[in-house]
Amino acid sequence: MAASPNPLQGSLFEESKQSTTNGGKETNNSIGSSENLSNQQLKSDASLRPRIRKTSKNPNQINDLDQLSNAEIEEPKWSHHNLPKIDDLTPALKHYVQLKIENPDRVLLYRLGDFFECFFEDAITLSQLLEITLTSKEGGKKIGKVPMAGIPHHASDRYCTELIKKGLSIAICDQLEAAPSKGNKLIKRGITRLITPGTIIEEGMLSAKQNNWLASVLLESDSNSDFVNWSLAKLDVSTGEFLVQEGKETNNLRQELIKLKAAEVISESKSISNQNWYKGLIEITEFNQTSFSRLEAKTTIENHYFLNNIDGLGIHPESLSIRTIGGLIAYLNKTHPNIGNNLKNEVKTNICIDFPQIKHNQAGLIIDNQTRRNLEITSTQKNGQFQGSLLWAIDKTLTAMGGRCIRRWLEEPLTEIYSIQSRQKIIGLLVESSSLRKNIRKILRAMGDLERLSGRAGAQQAGARDLIAIAEGINRLPLIKKYLNDPIFEETKYFESIINLDRDLIELASKINNEIIDNPPLSLTEGGLIFDGVNPILDGLRNQLDDHNSWLKSQEIEERKNSNINNLKLQYHRSFGYFLAVSKAKSINVPDHWIRRQTLTNEERFVTPELKEREGKIFQLRARISQLEYDLFCKLRILVGNKSDIIRKAAKAISCLDVLSGLAELAATNNYIQPKIIDNKDSTKTRRLSIVDGRHPVVEQILVDKFFVPNDIELGSKTDLIILSGPNASGKSCYLRQVGLLQIMAQIGSWIPAKSANIGIADQLFTRVGAVDDLASGQSTFMVEMIETAFILNNATENSLVLLDEIGRGTSTFDGLSIAWSVSEFLAKKIKSRSIFATHYHELNQISEYIENVENYKVVVEYKNHSLSFLHKVEKGGANKSYGIEAARLAGVPPDVVNNARLILKNLEKNNSNTIQITKPIESCK
């Protein structure tokens, strides 16, 4: 069918219908072809035949609504606020409008056959955002055609992902039966999902190795102090992980939310109405305030987990966290309205999520967000890429759930020595036994994402292929259990769910494999899901269908014989059903009782009354078979969903095993060693940080064809502060980051790149490496630097690790030196944290002369004949030159500039008598 012409489009090449006369006189049109006309001739022609400018609206500036036409002020014709009368619509569109009224702020995707369709304003929105064709559909006799746009149901995840990225929420109206029930003309449909950024469970819409967090946050004033109490609950709907924490300062909440990178954050309007701390940082969705009330939240929690009371959660019933948990679950229930419903609405279950776990603020190594960026733990600082980060360097996981697990470990390193040592022991066993490691990794390589697969099953959103993947994963568990027979694996709680494998899971996997065919279709409502021999009624229906198919084959032979048309074929078309096809030449010989159905260029198609009757019976059988197969599948999916919590426990064990075997592979192939973690009970050694020949875990892998120079570090026993000096580009910043990354690796239980190491557990890790303007908040580079420094000095303890680079360089020389000097003394004498201070201020080397826990180190360089060579070796002693001019030369600064800089430097050194010399400590820092 030809497309309708665009009414806004016209031909660019139409001949002008304008008269060629001017004032009754004929104009000269014979002056030559247009390409030969001069500019003067064209101007002359324009003056003789002036063109009148056509305008569609007043070009003047609009200052008042009265200047606008009614059409511009009113809602667009197809806006959902201006929908036509429901009674005038066709039945399908009538249902669509009813659902749209219930979901006015969401794009409504309505399943019709193989497509999800949108109508009215949503169709226009869909067409514009996804750049798909906007068409129309008959809306009723009084309505006429209405806008329509659609997406294929099998590709809906991809399109929904695009809509979510563009900030929209989606309501999914799907078919609730394979064929219309008896007495109904329309297939039953209903809202099955409300998709928002934080409630996604569909595989194609999620990042495999990253959590997708939905968070709820509440704040309230503390009547006993000036602080604001806050509670943050976070849930990954796809994996079931559920954590909650509380605090007292909004800055701490801000840090947690930056680290979390939640896909969606909800709150009640009362909590955020007068708050500014989150603006410009995150978008917060306001949710029903009553859902966050203590009474309703308590009821929501009890109903969801089938509890008589909430005391068993371990959360005080009067705490703010009860409200954040209840509000979050209420939001989840709203976005998954029909969780667990099968076609006949016989079963309803709750989506499977873990019991909320209390996360204590001091439970792990505290790393602020500036430090995370500086150390490039999960993404690079410059462009936010994965490649070049610590996670990129050490992630050798083979499964999606293992990838998420190692990311969580890096984001929250441990401070409890037993847990760290448990991980170390398992890695050690897997390093020593390469065959054990390789066998385990071979099993894991093809393991599906059991965490998210079981989550979809629990939400009754899993497809047939999802259940097959679950069964394949479960079938690998006994083999993994076989390899976990060493006592070291039994000492930790990680692998309890596999060592004590639930036999019900094995039986469930067997049931899945026995009932669902090996390669099932994506569609669940078109049959072809269930093996023969599973259900006697299904087998009987299939036998009946086979009989009809046999009749079709015999009928083709019989009609060919009776008509004497040898090339006759009995065929099927999805739109036309069954028909008899003959060539054009033979069509004159067809029997009289044949009825012409369709004419093609080289073929004629016919039907017979008997064939049409048989076709109706076949279609009815197919519909019954498809419906029964879907019902059987739903029952099986419910069984899997009921076991989703057990499957998830096994999945968490698999994810830990994947991480540990990956870290063992990393250690074995990169010559890593097991660091000795110093027990906190040994107060004389607990702060020690001693690493021999340590290497940067990321840079070492990037320097494929070059040798990485290893370096030592000794802090915490006698020395608390190292003053590190050396020229630009010599490796000071790399050394600082190396120390920080090795501390993190040690506290997640990993082995590290070094010759030997004794590492005390740090409670906090701070870095200040480089700074940039914060234009959004009007802060200069120097102010940003001072704010970061103040945060460190106000929060660090003697058990912290502090790494500072170039403090004080953003102001005048003497101001900067004074600040750097004072900060160094404060760290060494007041806080006594393990600290490294990299600087170009060589005067700071004097501090070690009167503060005994300060020591000078330098990055060694070779300088001969105005040529500078970086050796990247850190040694004891202070540097006395910065070699900044030589570094500029190496960077490609023009020779004239470099030579002139040398002359200027000589004059400055000759004339500068303001040498700084301090021989006694600053009294205020004693």
From Swiss-Prot:
The organism is Prochlorococcus marinus (strain NATL1A)
So where does ATP get bound? 726-733
Q: Which InterPro entries match?
A: DNA_mismatch_repair_MutS, DNA_mismatch_repair_MutS-lik_N, DNA_mismatch_repair_MutS/MSH, DNA_mismatch_repair_MutS_C, DNA_mismatch_repair_MutS_clamp, DNA_mismatch_repair_MutS_core, DNA_mismatch_repair_MutS_N, DNA_mismatch_repair_MutS_sf
Q: Where is the composition biased (Polar residues)?
A: 18-44, 57-67
Q: Which UniProt keywords apply?
A: ATP-binding, DNA damage, DNA repair, DNA-binding, Nucleotide-binding
Q: Name one Pfam family in it.
A: MutS_III
The GO annotation for biological process reads: mismatch repair
Q: Which GO terms describe its molecular function?
A: ATP binding; ATP-dependent DNA damage sensor activity; damaged DNA binding; mismatched DNA binding
Q: Which Gene3D superfamilies match?
A: 1.10.1420.10, DNA repair protein MutS, domain I, MutS, connector domain, P-loop containing nucleotide triphosphate hydrolases
Query: Disulphide bridges in this chain?
Result: none
Q: Which family does it belong to?
A: Belongs to the DNA mismatch repair MutS family.
Tell me the protein's name.
DNA mismatch repair protein MutS
**Start and end residues of each stretch annotated as Disordered:** 1-67
One cellular component (GO) term of this entry? cytosol
SUPFAM superfamilies registered for this protein in UniProt: DNA repair protein MutS, domain I, DNA repair protein MutS, domain II, DNA repair protein MutS, domain III, P-loop containing nucleoside triphosphate hydrolases
Top-rank taxon of the source lineage equals: Bacteria
Q: Which PANTHER family match?
A: DNA MISMATCH REPAIR PROTEIN MSH1, MITOCHONDRIAL, DNA MISMATCH REPAIR PROTEIN MUTS FAMILY MEMBER
Purpose: This protein is involved in the repair of mismatches in DNA. It is possible that it carries out the mismatch recognition step. This protein has a weak ATPase activity.
